[in-house]
């Protein structure tokens, strides 16, 4: 049988793809982080739903692999896209011991693109996505990536800017960026994408340093071509300049 690693998209499921919905309908078992299982529980009352808490990712993926290897179609659900800070890579790594198991990754809408749509069009040119979580990546590595992305004039999208224990990571990241970029650089944040309390704000890099982010926040730092147009964050692709 098959293990499907499924992206639920943003929020409570309104942004889920038709492919993802079809897979969840077809699978006998749905596995995921407790909060994500709760998002789909009402829609799939007749499925077997299995969940594990935060920081039990290895256990969760092994559970899904074992159930699929036993002959069932299993869906491992992730928020956003399973290949962007999701469970796709871990499932594929752990499945090395099950070479006969078929694994399919079902893409979803990630916070970078869903958040960008709420702000306007900040990702229309080259961009870098960086997580500020240092749980699995040393902070020194994160700082180096931030600095290099700023020097290269990428638009930067930040995932995981804060948590209950990581309250100052966004400020520290802004300090790194401010060593390369002006405080007036256009930025934006989106909170609770697709959920109650959804919010999109546009301000400067200097103002971003003082912003109180949480684990449901996605941050955008513009490049030299990023402007605020009618309260929307817009990065030029260059078409108008080509016509001049």
PLM feature spans:
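Fold-independent oxyanion-binding glycine-rich loops
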Residues: 8-12, 33-35, 52-54, 79-81, ...
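A contiguous loop/helix-start segment that scaffolds small-molecule binding in enzyme catalytic cores
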Residues: 3-5, 73-74, 151-244
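Short gly/ser/thr-rich secondary-structure transition/capping motifs
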Residues: 9-15, 137-139, 201-203
């Amino acid at each position: 049988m098959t293990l499907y690693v499924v992206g639920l998209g943003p929020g409570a499921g309104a942004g889920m793809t038709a492919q993802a919905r079809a897979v969840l309908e077809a699978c006998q078992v749905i596995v995921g982080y407790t909060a994500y299982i709760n998002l789909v529980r009402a829609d799939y009352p007749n499925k077997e739903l299995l969940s594990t808490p935060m920081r039990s990712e290895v256990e969760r993926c092994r559970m899904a692999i074992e159930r699929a290897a036993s002959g069932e179609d299993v869906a491992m659900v992730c928020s956003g896209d399973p290949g962007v800070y999701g469970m796709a890579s871990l499932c594929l790594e752990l499945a090395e011991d099950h070479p006969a198991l078929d694994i399919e990754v079902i893409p979803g809408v990630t916070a970078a693109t869903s958040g960008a749509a709420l702000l306007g069009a900040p990702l229309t040119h080259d961009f870098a996505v960086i997580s500020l979580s240092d749980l699995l990546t040393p902070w020194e590595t994160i700082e180096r990536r931030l600095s290099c992305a700023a020097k290269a004039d990428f638009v930067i999208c930040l995932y995981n800017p804060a948590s209950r224990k990581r309250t100052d990571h966004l400020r520290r990241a802004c300090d790194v960026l401010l060593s390369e970029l002006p405080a007036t650089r256009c930025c934006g944040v989106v909170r609770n994408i697709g959920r109650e309390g959804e919010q999109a704000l546009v301000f400067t890099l200097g103002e971003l340093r003082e912003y109180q982010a949480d684990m449901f926040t996605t941050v955008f730092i513009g490049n030299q071509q990023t402007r605020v147009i009618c309260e929307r964050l817009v990065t030029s692709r260059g078409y108008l300049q080509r016509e001049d």
